[in-house]
UniProtKB/Swiss-Prot annotation:
InterPro entries registered for this protein in UniProt: bZIP (IPR004827), bZIP_sf (IPR046347), TGA_domain (IPR025422)
Region Disordered: start-end pairs: 87-181
Keywords: DNA-binding, Nucleus, Plant defense, Transcription, Transcription regulation
Biased composition annotated in UniProt, kind: Low complexity: 87-99, 148-159
Gene coding for it: TGAL11
Basic motif: annotated span: 183-203
Biased amino acid composition, Basic and acidic residues: 171-181
Protein's name in the database: Transcription factor TGAL11
Length: 489
């Protein structure tokens, strides 16, 4: 049994050692051993061959295990081949060489020479095993080459996927833009229109600021020119004013600014054809604004009555029409009445009666003020002399009497302001809402034109002033003959 098994093992593993040998050569070498060495020499040769084949089988198994380990690591993506050439080189390295490891120095064992029939079967089995081993090695090389090609194709596939994703996202964005809700599209259009209007308003506002800056610079130049010529708007040059007068000037400046805004509201309400209720509120506000002016004037009269009477708070053109420190009611009615047409008969009668009563009150106040002036002049004239010590006492007495008479001047100014205020209230009662709006608007425009006239007068060039002075001299010379004609009178 031992010899039979020993004879089978070498022939079973023979296919692993003889890579590339053919069956006739094997049979010829077997016959050669049988003929040359007899039975003992063939047994010795096959004993050595058995040892070599066993060693070769162990070596081939280890190489097969290493090849399987390398293939597993390739599939686990630890050390992939970069190219197909590298995979082919690894496959060629893993293939065992077509030689036998035969060492004659090993101990030789005797065995019986197998029969020719057994030898033929063993050689056939070895040839089959050799073919299967070659096929397995070829399959492993092809798998490694396919694996390397797959690793080379991975970056290209990733790039293609990125391109597809980008194209799909762009397509989806276009589709979302096309399928937006009409409300959203309309809202976006409204937002764009609002932004455009906002930019236009900003541009117009900047232009308005620039034009206002230019006008302010022009006004400063005009004011400086007026000061150099000795003409000051709303005040006497170099005059000392009291604290009450300075406070009134500041309050009056703010009152003028508020009056400009109220005039704009009246103008807008008339052109917009507002209802009577809304327009009445604007008219009542304008009337209350004039009541505020009369309150300021009463406080200024108590602080410094001469400041109101002299009209230093007004412009030069307005001073020409002052009456007791303000406008004359009858003259104002004559100026405003033509702009209130059409008027009913009842309104005409009411305005005429108001004008007559105003004239009567004005005459009474004017007569009283004239008497006060005459009395004050007599008191100051008969006051004695300051140089004479004997008459110094009488002088101080007359001065105290003159101061008492001057205090009556405050009463005249307050009564004149009351007459002005009552005239405005009576006009408000007689006229309709729209007529009253036109009345207050006409009064405001009248005083604005007077102030504008003063500004133009103050801003005249000096050459025109010199020419006017020359013309006045010529007129005075030309008027001398006419004066001589009426010298007797």
């Amino acid at each position: 049994m031992g010899e039979a098994r020993r004879g089978q093992n070498p022939h079973h593993v023979l296919g692993y050692g003889f890579h590339g040998t053919t069956l006739p050569n094997s049979m010829a070498s077997a016959n050669l051993f049988e003929q040359g060495g007899g039975g003992g020499g063939g047994a010795a040769y096959f004993g050595e061959l058995e040892e070599a084949l066993v060693h070769q089988v162990a070596t081939l198994r280890r190489r097969a295990q290493q090849t399987a380990t390398t293939t597993t690591s390739h599939h686990g993506h630890t050390t992939p081949f970069s190219t197909a050439a590298a995979a082919a080189t690894a496959t060629a390295t893993a293939r065992p060489p077509a030689t036998l490891d035969i060492f004659p120095s090993w101990p030789m064992r005797r065995s019986s020479l197998p029969t020719p029939k057994d030898g033929c079967s063993n050689v056939t089995a070895d040839t089959t095993d050799s073919e299967s081993s070659s096929k397995n090695n070829g399959d492993q090389g092809a798998a490694a080459a396919d694996m390397a090609s797959q690793f080379d194709q991975i970056p290209q596939q990733q790039q293609k996927q990125h391109k597809k994703m980008a194209a799909s996202s762009t397509h989806s964005d276009h589709r979302m833009t096309k399928t937006l809700d009409p409300k959203i599209m309309r809202r976006l259009a409204q937002n764009r229109e609002a932004a455009r209007k906002s930019r236009l308003r900003k541009k117009a506002y900047i232009q308005q600021l620039e034009s206002s800056k230019l006008r302010l610079a022009q006004m400063e130049q005009d004011l400086e020119r007026a000061r150099s010529q000795g003409l000051l708007l709303g005040g006497s040059p170099g005059g000392n004013t009291s604290a009450g007068a300075a406070m009134f000037d500041a309050e009056y400046g703010r009152w003028l600014e508020d009056g400009g805004r109220r005039m704009a509201e009246l103008h807008g309400g008339l052109h917009a054809h507002l209802p009577d209720g809304d327009l009445r509120a604007i008219v009542d506000d304008a009337l209350a604004h004039y009541d505020e002016l009369f309150r300021l004037r009463a406080a200024a009269a108590k602080a410094d009555v001469f400041h109101l009477i002299t009209g230093t708070w007004a412009t030069p053109a307005e001073r020409c029409f002052l009456w007791m420190g303000g406008f004359q009611p009858s003259d104002l009615l004559k100026t405003v009445a033509p702009q209130l047409d059409p008027l009913t008969e009842q309104q005409v009668v009411g305005i005429c009666s108001l004008q007559q009563s105003s004239q009567q009150a004005e005459e009474a106040l004017s007569q009283g003020l004239e008497q006060l002036h005459q009395s004050l002049a007599e008191t100051v004239a008969n006051g004695g002399s300051v140089v004479n010590e004997a008459s110094l006492g009488s002088f101080m007495g007359y001065m105290a009497l003159a101061l008492g008479k001057l205090s009556n001047l405050e009463g005249f100014v307050i009564q004149a302001d009351n007459l002005r205020q009552q005239t405005l209230h009576q006009m408000h009662r007689i006229l309709t809402i729209r007529q009253a709006a036109r009345c207050f608007l006409a009064i405001g425009e009248y005083h604005n034109r007077l102030r504008a006239l003063s500004s133009l007068w103050a801003s005249r060039p000096r050459e025109i002033l010199v020419a006017d002075e020359g013309n006045c001299g010529e007129l005075s010379i030309a008027a001398q003959p006419s004066e001589s004609q009426f010298s007797a009178f």
